[in-house]
Amino acid sequence: MENTILIGVITQDQDKEKSKEYLDELEFLTTTAGGVVVKRFTQNLDTPNPKTFLGSGKIKEVLNFIDAVKVQTVIFDDELSPAQERNISKIFNCKILDRTNLILDI
């Protein structure tokens, strides 16, 4: 069982309630794959950061949590580009998945 955190972005096209529904579904998929969700993070963004998907402040917040709780996996509710996945993996130093990769893992 891997300690896992979920990350979702709330955009102008998606309200908080819809984001919660998506994260609920992602948590179910994570549990099905054998992960244990220890925290959820969300960020309000008009458009995701092309390099790291999240803003720098949220990256620091998530990184501090990863270090404190010994998280092994971070799962994003949205699809990441290969470059974003690489960049985030270097920063967080743990396994990074997006929704599509999680579903393929199941």
Question: Which residues make up each language-model segment?
Answer:
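N-terminal accessory targeting/assembly segments
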Residues: 1-105
